[in-house]
Amino acid sequence: MVLSPKQEEELRFAVADYLQSCGYTNALEAFKKDASIPKEIDNKKYSGLLEKKWTSVVRLQKKVMDLELRLNNTTREMNSGVPTRNSRSSNDWIPRPPEKHSLSGHRSPITCVVFHPVYNVMVSSSEDASMKIWDYESGDFERTLRGHTDSVQDLAFDSSGKLLASSSADMTVKIWDFQTFECRMTLRGHDHNVSSVCFLPSGDFLLSSSRDKTIKMWEVATGYCVYNFEGHREWVRRVAVASDGSLMASCSNDQTVRIWSLSSKECKEELRGHEHVVECIKWAPESCNRYINEASGTEVPKGQKSGPFLASGSRDRVIKIWDVTTAVCLFSLVGHDNWVRGLAFHAGGKYLTSASDDKTIKIWELRHKRCSKSLEAHNHFVTTIDFHRSSPFVITGSVDLTIKVWECR
């Protein structure tokens, strides 16, 4: 490698400074004479420069080694016959490294990412009190939505994608018109942080859960609170509605999951088994039923339907799969080294993906109850994950302030 005259001068003076700082007097004098260096050296300018250059080289070497490892793994996958997206069923597509896009723009940790149900855009929310809209295919930033005065905790679209709901630590829920990007209404009534929000399938009602230990049902047209669900003994972290709109699930700091009837408004079941705060829940689509039945050894008589099934993730590092009808935990998925923060089912039903504070996302093959792939996804806690219902993309968000788009194949 050929150094420029300026680089040569920097190197000579940096070596001289190093010899001087180490007390190598004889070597220093000889080096000064051979390298034509004046007797006096500007200590401030060159102090520690050689050590800094050396540590920079070490860091770059490590980065190169990491990149080489990722390249080798990708090459090995291709050469060992891992099917490409064109040659395998979409039911078998799973996210693979490296990420397609790494999106930056938020000034504080990412709290939620969600795909739009129709358009090729996604929305992210952050502790910086803002929401950002991105084109997940191109990676382009489109616009920022502002209105909350504290951390935005959760996001949800209605089935048409015309409305976006956001919940916040400012104790409010906002409903946004996703065509004009204006806040249509602000829902007030919770007494603490509103940690979760979701629409009922009809789009007529909205549910929100809060640190005030309650779940509220809101009429979307009027913004009125029409019912207040009580039963959890601590912070209600998440609320989720079954695809047919008949049942609601909620999870809490009280280490339980509750199943509620939305017609009678009664708590039907309390699911116990986790040993710490239950951070997240997700209803399994019907496409998962056959794989969950195989995994649990359940034989379903002809003409009968199984399920519904629910997944829960906890700070105890465990994911549990529940039969909601019997209130039984069918099996547990163990493998994360830290809190489980997010869950998303593959639309094809074979896989469940999870996000964790161990900085990874894991892809679980439900039939065999095993982790089939683990991705080092972020440089800090992975707080949220979403799996597109029809396109081959997964998105994740992290405390490292980035959102990543992963392509599936």
Curated annotation (Swiss-Prot):
Coiled coil: 56-81
Subcellular location: Cytoplasm, Cytoskeleton; Cytoplasm, Cytoskeleton, Microtubule organizing center, Centrosome
Single annotated GO MF: dynein complex binding
Lineage top rank: taxon: Eukaryota
CDD domains (UniProt xref): WD40
A cellular component term, taken from the record's GO annotations: kinetochore
Domain LisH: 7-39
Pfam families, per database record: LisH_PAC1, WD40
GO terms classed as biological process: cell division; establishment of mitotic spindle orientation; microtubule organizing center organization; microtubule sliding; nuclear migration; vesicle transport along microtubule
Region feature (Disordered): 75-105
Family matches, as InterPro entries: Dynein_regulator_LIS1, G-protein_beta_WD-40_rep, LIS1_N, LisH, PAC1-like_LisH-like_dom, WD40/YVTN_repeat-like_dom_sf, WD40_repeat_CS, WD40_repeat_dom_sf
Main localization (coarse): cytoplasm
Keywords: Cell cycle, Cell division, Coiled coil, Cytoplasm, Cytoskeleton, Microtubule, Mitosis, Repeat, Transport, WD repeat
Domain text: Dimerization mediated by the LisH domain may be required to activate dynein.
PANTHER family documented for this protein: WD REPEAT DOMAIN 5B, WD40 REPEAT PROTEIN
HAMAP family, alphabetized: lis1
Family assignment from sequence similarity: Belongs to the WD repeat LIS1/nudF family.
Function: Positively regulates the activity of the minus-end directed microtubule motor protein dynein. May enhance dynein-mediated microtubule sliding by targeting dynein to the microtubule plus end. Required for several dynein- and microtubule-dependent processes.
Protein name listed in UniProt: Lissencephaly-1 homolog
